[in-house]
Amino acid sequence: MPARYAVYYAPSAGDALHQAVTPLLGRDALGGLNVPQATPPGVDPVFWKAVTRVPAHYGLHATLKAPFELRHSGMDSQLLRSTGEVASRFLPFAIPSLSLAYQGKEEKGFYALVPSTKCSLLSFLERACVMDLDAFRAPLKTEDVARRGHLSLEERSNLYMWGYHRVLDSFQFHITLTDGIADA
């Protein structure tokens, strides 16, 4: 299977967000290590482990450019350089406070941390990552498209154009905390 690349936001190890959420997921994404998984107060530990299986695999992050295969092998150093160029166009900025929110459809949504107020800089950064790095992305395979299931016209257009359905105007910054579960 060819390597896949993505651009993620991940807070530094000393950041309060990293220190608070990493134990809840049981994985340190920065170090690539499993850590003892903590359970939120009042939540059954068996239930928590079950509903965090997928996010725990990846650790604390938010996607800015969804995973993709390279258009041509050997482009990884160019991709890294171009990603650095995109990042260099942005001064460091703070993400607004985060709130816990239920995302998606009732029967298959998930809980995530989302900005409590709109952050245009996040949208601009995501847009730059999606558009400026897309030349490195290999075309989608039939199974990639099929895996997405039913999409709106805009989502399907985004999928074919940019390799992912929730980008640009459909983008919402989020840090996934659970697998798909029915809204409680």
Outline where the language-model segments fall.
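Basic, often amphipathic N-terminal segments
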Residues: 1-96, 100-105, 124-184
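Positively charged, aromatic-accented nucleic-acid-binding surfaces
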Residues: 115-119, 123-127
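Short, conserved secondary-structure transition motifs
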Residues: 101-117
